[in-house]
UniProtKB/Swiss-Prot annotation:
A single GO BP: negative regulation of defense response to oomycetes
Induction trigger: Accumulates during infection by filamentous (hemi)biotrophic oomycetes (e.g. H.arabidopsidis and P.parasitica) and fungal (e.g. E.cruciferarum) pathogens, being locally expressed in cells surrounding the pathogens both at early and late stages of infection. Induced by microbe-associated molecular patterns (MAMPs) flg22 or elf18.
Transmembrane segments: 516-536
Enzyme class of the recorded protein, top EC level: transferase
Organism from which the protein derives: Arabidopsis thaliana (Mouse-ear cress)
GO cellular component terms, A-Z: plasma membrane; pollen tube
Protein name as catalogued: LRR receptor-like serine/threonine-protein kinase IOS1
Gene3D superfamilies: Phosphorylase Kinase, domain 1, Ribonuclease Inhibitor, Transferase(Phosphotransferase) domain 1
Boundaries of every Protein kinase domain copy: 586-858
């Protein structure tokens, strides 16, 4: 189509006005010219973007420049580059604001800076692979974009060497977006295409025309025709596509044909989000209508839709789209029977999903390690990026925990023979899961700090071969004497215990013979102490030891785990006396609840609230359950299981001391006993997912496998943050190691939650827990009693099944939710629950499958809630593509 002079004039006026506005707002822009000298900056002449040196954001790499002859072909931010000949992983670190959404762009141009233009290396966003960067010649430029919502206040972008080629980078650009745009259920978005559809100029553009500095490329197709207008188009919605893109569009050349957009050359596992921008840019006659449906892989997903006159409407998918059975991704705009005009499309953005599955190391621990690195001047070539992940690139001398769906934490730090000077840094105390600390063979000075004694997880401290002085904290020496910690201090001639330091001070004015003699005696005593400690420790490995806290000489209930070693939390989960329990509960002053086991009291231990469960009678069954729970909780640790703080066993006085769960149990909240506040559907899904994770850990994360046997809403407790944790393990059973798929037991559990197959056969499997959890899920959806003799069907599962058979899901949903939920997630949870309740255990899902289903539902509900909070300055101009989402609770819509 010819480009009219009038339209060209409008286009040039818009373009010139934007470029001449040198003071145009660049707040939220971070533009790094990689490899340029520190403190240098410039304004790029075609975009007027100000770039600064990257030197303040990275400590490694060397600067370089492209060949002089290439500079006229490329923008100035690519004239320099930073290469990384040393190390495997090198990272940029930017301090930003958690929750902000950024467009992140990495630019690569070899430009002949060395004689090896053929390269391949990897680009990482934090601990997750972003993309593989490949160059084959000097003038091949590559750009990688990611739209990412920050989950921490530190962003790291890393280049990783994967072969012999040297990684490099030319420019790094971050553009802050509005937090209401480009929302996903999970993961981040990598740019697949950003197209100015129907563009009449074959040239891309970015900032100065696009307020967010998105890079747009022209896109036309042989069977499409371009249309344009010289009128202005309102672009003021959240996405703000550039007006230059919106004053042009494409329509099918054949007015009866559909507009098909096919994504080719894509692996069928890739998921996409699609954003389409529409505006009617033709003056329609009174009898003209432009109306069309949006199809995906021959399925109707939105419409009929009519673009607004000279006003931008943005249509997007709130959930990812996937390939069909043939691996195809085909979007189609098809005119309706009421339409006199063909469909049109002005602009389009398509992004692939990068799930970024690897969680970053705990934020506080990363800060601690960065501070330790800086303060000690640690110069280890691999101390770049995240200390723990990915595992292949973790820091030397650092070991971490790696548990699915949990943030990695540092459990071991070895800085021996690292040339450290100064005092022992208090930053170490921020490593709250640290078990082993080795600072040996350095030049550390000062005293042994008290905070080391207060780190509850520490089991081994090696301070030998330093220049430490003063007294060792008495609490640390006491922990060593009790065997809860191993302390090595050899070679620190100025160190002494508190007692020996006092003696030395008192006799300071004596003759030289006295201190020499005292030193010899001290050496002898220390040596004797070490020998004694080693002997006792050796005996401890071969014989059950006495509990130092009991004072009664009784043997602990659980002194060895099933793997043949003492559980690491024995020292923390200590045995208490009955007198201790009386003090903790202030003579059993406040009752929290009562159950079949006994009474639960409120208590305070070490200034922290606890719950104390007392066994009322020393029955054989009660003692057996008590012993089972202590033994289980001393070896099982998970964030979604209640934590045992201590226990007491003195004759018939038996108690369990737990962390205090401030918000009681799930049943109380569903029943309204906790007040008028209502658990939202998102809150219920979160509780379901967390308790499912705890149960899944018992089934699959414990060796031998553990079956809870009493899953119910009263055994799901909620802490002050409403995090759910499974409780009450008195009926739990461990499976013997081996190939057994079930054990034969006397039936135990709670009526209504009890697996009928287990009740009938006495055969217990993990699928018995799955049945009980299915009942819990139905309670979360319906808020109905498990057994109600007044109902047409007394058991909740039978009643829900009856309602579903009548196509009446509306009547089963808790009316307290007031319709504030995504009906698809209701359906999904009910379907999952009914599968869990299958009479045949072999046809029930595993808890792993249940966790996956619930997380999917939670993500969908979170995305819906984020979407409902979005504002749009053009009212109804921003429309979601509803991918099989229903608007009413109607089973027919599914």
């Amino acid at each position: 189509m010819a480009f009219s002079s009038c339209f060209l004039l409008v286009l040039l006026q818009i373009f010139s006005a934007l470029l001449l506005c040198l003071a145009q707002d660049q707040s939220g822009f971070i533009s790094l010219d990689c490899g340029s000298p520190r403190e240098t900056s410039f304004r790029e002449k075609t975009t007027n973007i100000t770039y600064i040196s990257d030197a303040n954001f990275i400590n490694t790499g060397v600067g370089g420049s492209i060949k002089q002859g290439y500079r006229t072909q490329f923008q100035q931010q690519t004239w320099n580059l930073r290469s990384f000949p040393q190390g495997i992983r090198n990272c940029y670190t930017l301090n930003l604001t958690i929750g902000d959404e950024y467009l992140i762009r990495a630019n690569f141009l070899h430009g002949g800076y060395d004689d090896k233009p053929s390269t391949q290396f990897e680009l990482y966003l934090g601990p997750n692979l972003w993309s593989t960067v490949t160059t084959t010649n000097e003038t091949e430029a590559s750009i990688f974009e990611m739209i990412h919502i920050l989950t921490t206040d530190r962003l790291q972008i890393c280049l990783v060497k994967t072969g012999n080629a040297t990684p490099f980078i030319s420019a790094l650009e971050l553009r802050k977006l509005m937090n209401t745009t480009y929302l996903t259920r999970q993961g981040s978005l990598q740019t697949f295409i950003r197209a100015d559809v129907g563009a009449t100029v074959n040239q891309g553009y970015r900032y100065g025309i696009d307020v967010f500095d998105r890079v747009w490329t022209p896109y036309n197709f042989g069977n499409w025709s371009q249309i344009s207008t010289n009128q202005s188009v309102n672009i003021n919605n959240d996405y703000q596509p550039p007006e230059i893109a919106m004053v042009t569009a494409s329509v099918p050349t054949d007015p009866d044909a559909a507009m098909n957009i096919s994504l080719v050359g894509v692996e069928r596992t890739v998921q996409f989000y699609v954003f389409m921008h529409f505006a009617e840019i033709q003056e329609l006659k009174s009898n003209d209508t432009r109306e069309f449906n949006i199809m995906y892989n021959n399925k109707h997903i939105y419409g009929p839709f009519r673009p607004l006159n000279f006003t931008t409407s943005s249509v997007f998918t709130p959930t990812e789209v996937v390939a069909d059975a043939n691996g195809q991704y085909i979007f189609s705009l098809q005119r309706t029977g009421n339409s006199t005009l063909p469909p049109l499309l002005n602009a389009m953005e398509i992004y692939s999903v990068n799930l970024l599955p690897q969680q970053e190391t705990d934020r506080k621990e990363v800060d601690a390690m960065m501070n330790i690195k800086s303060a000690y001047g640690v110069n280890k070539i691999d101390w770049e990026g995240d200390p723990c992940v990915p595992l292949d690139y973790k820091w030397s001398g650092v070991n971490c925990t790696y548990v699915d769906n949990e943030t990695p934490k540092i459990i071991s730090l070895d800085l021996s023979t690292s040339g450290l000077t100064g005092e022992i840094l208090e930053f170490i105390s921020d490593l709250t899961s640290l078990e082993v600390l080795d600072l040996s063979n350095n030049s550390l000075t000062g005293s042994v700090p008290e905070f080391l004694a207060n780190m509850e997880t520490l089991k081994l401290i090696n301070l030998s071969g330093n220049e430490l002085n003063g007294s060792i904290p008495a609490t640390l020496l006491d922990k060593e004497r009790r065997g809860s910690i191993t302390l090595s201090i050899e070679g620190n001639t100025g160190l002494c215990s508190s007692t020996s330091c006092a003696t030395t001070k008192k006799k300071k004015k004596n003759t030289v013979i006295a201190p020499v003699a005292a030193s010899l005696v001290s050496v002898f005593l220390i040596g004797a102490g070490i020998v004694t400690f080693l002997i006792l420790k050796r005996k401890k490995r071969t014989k059950l030891g006495l509990n130092p806290n009991s004072g009664t000489g009784t043997t602990p209930l659980h002194s060895r785990s099933h793997h043949g070693f003492e559980p690491p939390v024995i020292a923390k989960n200590r045995k208490l006396t009955y007198i201790d329990v009386v003090k903790i509960t202030n003579n059993f002053e406040r009752v929290l609840g009562r159950g079949g086991f006994g009474v639960v009291y409120y208590g305070v231990l070490n200034n922290e609230p606890v719950a104390v469960k007392m066994l009322t009678e020393s029955t054989a069954l009660g003692y057996k359950q008590f012993k089972a729970e202590v033994e289980l909780l001393l070896r099982v640790h998970h964030k979604d299981l209640t934590c045992l703080v201590g226990y007491c066993e003195e004759g018939d006085k038996m108690s369990l001391i737990y962390e205090f769960m401030a918000n009681g149990d799930l049943k109380e909240h569903l029943s309204g006993k906790r007040g008028p506040s209502i658990l939202t559907w998102e809150g219920r899904l979160r509780i379901a997912a967390e308790s499912a994770q705890g149960l899944e850990y018992l089934h699959n994360g414990c060796k031998p496998q553990i079956v809870h046997r009493d899953i119910k809403t009263t055994n799901i407790l909620l802490n002050e943050k409403f995090q759910a944790k499974l409780a009450d393990f008195g009926l739990s059973r461990s499976f013997p190691l081996g190939t057994e798929t079930h054990v034969s037991t006397i039936v135990a559990g709670t009526p209504g939650y009890l697996d009928p197959e287990y009740y009938r056969t006495n055969w217990l499997t993990e699928k018995s827990d799955v049945f009980s959890f299915g009942v819990v899920l139905l309670e979360l959806v319906t808020n109905q009693p498990v057994i109600d003799m007044k109902r047409e069907k007394s058991h909740i599962a039978e009643w829900v099944g009856l309602m579903l058979s009548r196509g009446d899901i509306n009547s089963i949903v808790d009316p307290k939710l007031q319709g504030d939920f995504d009906p698809n997630t209701i359906w999904k949870v009910v379907e999952t629950a009914m599968t869990c309740l299958n009479p045949s255990s072999s046809r029930r899902p595993t808890m792993t499958q249940v966790v996956m289903d619930l997380k999917e539902c939670l993500n969908m509900e979170m995305a819906r809630n984020m979407g409902s909070r979005m504002t749009d300055s053009t009212n109804d101009s921003s429309i979601e593509l509803s991918m099989n989402f229903t608007t009413e609770l109607n089973p027919g819509a599914r």
